[in-house]
From Swiss-Prot:
The gene is ZACN. This is Ligand-gated cation channel ZACN. Residues 255-265, 318-365 are cytoplasmic. Residues 325-354 are annotated as: Disordered. Residues 336-354 have a biased composition (Basic and acidic residues). It comes from Canis lupus familiaris.
Length: 409
């Protein structure tokens, strides 16, 4: 009883002082600047001296409220997402309770390192930045403890990019209490969406929490459901690609014998090659379930290549037939040989030249019709495939083998 009275007396005296006041038996002074339960750089030799509160035969129940205030820096090329969270941890520690009739204090605040706190680790975190380096816990007369932790973290996320730029992905933040077992500690988690800004490329349209089953250590998981607004990708990727394809079809209306047609087609092909090289760097890639846009733009490249090759081949065949017809002599009556030089600057073409030209133009016209029909059909086919296509990602290495991932029962 004496240590508890000494603890309460020191807690009440803190109202008139500025330093860390709650010290005594069973408490320790701060040893690191950051909270130990998220400090990845803390030496392994540092051991907790305060034991978890005893809740009898049942595990200690810690109620967790996760307030998500911002999600930003969604990088699909690095498969990372940054978020700002506020954690509210609540539990009951009867060792900190006092008689409210003798000490009429509604609540006291204690340093985080003066009492037991659950040691949490974010499994997917690359780094964690704390807004408050010295959080304080609020303790009620019944031993009810409230601890608020504000943090900014960057985590890994397995984006589902098959339908990019209209993709929807679930990003998980898994919190593990590795210093306790499920027989000692149990979490009950809730999530609240407090995001007020919608001016983002990726917006959070859903927020869920769950307790993963069959775990050896206590844990809870927060799932952020992200959806791409797609406006940037449509303007930067789809519009230029469709414009080049439409320009290529319009180029088929130029006469085959016009020298500008070959230059026009080659210029479009070279321009699309430059666009395609930058496109490959802008689109994400994955070991499985790559974006459908990668295949779509590859098909567009093949269509432009086929259209350019058709123009070059038919123009070459037409020119070769024209030269062969010019080189062969045309038999004419002797009386008409004197008048051959009076035909003017545009003499009548040889029959072989007309035949080769008409054959090439007919083939070009047929190819143009087939090409237009093929392009239109490919667009409808891709739209249907986009709507109905599904892809299941390959299992992660930690799930494919029995000994991988977190320990399971």
């Amino acid at each position: 009883m004496a240590p508890r009275l000494l603890l309460l007396l020191l807690a009440f005296l803190r109202l008139g002082t500025t330093g860390p006041l709650v010290q005594g038996r069973g408490f320790r002074s701060p040893t690191v600047a950051w909270p130990s339960f998220f400090n990845f750089n803390q030496p392994q030799g540092v051991q907790e001296t305060i034991q978890i509160p005893n809740n009898g035969s049942a595990p200690l129940l810690v109620d967790v409220q996760v307030f998500v205030s911002n999600v930003f820096n969604v990088d699909i090329l690095r498969y990372t997402v940054s978020s700002m969270l506020l954690l509210r941890l609540s539990w009951v520690d009867t060792r900190l309770a006092w008689n409210a009739s003798l000490y009429p204090q509604h609540a006291v605040t204690l340093p985080w390192d003066s009492l037991w706190t659950p040691g949490l680790t974010i499994q997917e975190a690359l780094w964690v930045d704390w807004q408050d380096q010295s959080p304080r816990a609020r303790v009620g007369p019944d031993g009810h403890v409230d601890l608020y932790l504000a943090l900014t973290t960057e985590t890994n996320c397995d984006f589902e990019l098959l339908h990019f730029p209209r993709d929807q992905s679930d990003c998980n933040l898994s919190f593990y209490a590795l210093s306790n077992t499920v027989l000692e500690l149990e979490f009950r988690a809730h999530a609240v969406n407090e995001i007020v800004s919608v001016k983002r490329e990726y917006v959070v349209w859903g927020l869920e929490t769950q307790i993963p089953p069959r775990q050896l250590v206590p844990c809870f998981q927060v799932t952020l459901r992200l959806q791409n607004t797609a406006l940037k990708a449509i303007i930067a990727l789809l519009v230029p690609g469709e414009a080049l394809l439409l320009a290529d079809m319009c180029g088929g209306l130029l006469p085959l014998r016009a020298t500008e047609r070959i230059a026009y087609k080659v210029t479009l092909l070279l321009g699309y090659l430059v666009f395609h090289s930058s496109l490959v760097q802008a689109l994400p890639s994955s070991s499985s379930c790559n974006p459908l846009l990668i295949y779509y733009f590859t098909v567009l490249l093949l269509l432009l290549f086929i259209s350019t090759m058709e123009t070059v081949l038919l123009a070459a065949l037409q020119a070769r037939g024209h030269l062969s017809a010019r080189s062969s002599p045309i038999p004419t009556p002797r009386g008409e040989q004197q008048d051959h030089g009076d035909l003017g600057p545009h003499p009548e073409e040889a029959p072989g030249v007309k035949e080769s030209r008409s054959w090439a133009e007919a083939a070009d016209h047929i190819f143009f019709l087939v090409y237009v029909v093929g392009v239109v059909c490919s667009q409808f086919f891709f739209i249907g495939f986009w709507m109905w296509a599904t892809c299941k990602s390959d299992p992660a290495p930690g799930e494919a083998i029995p000994h991988g991932g977190q320990p399971r029962l």
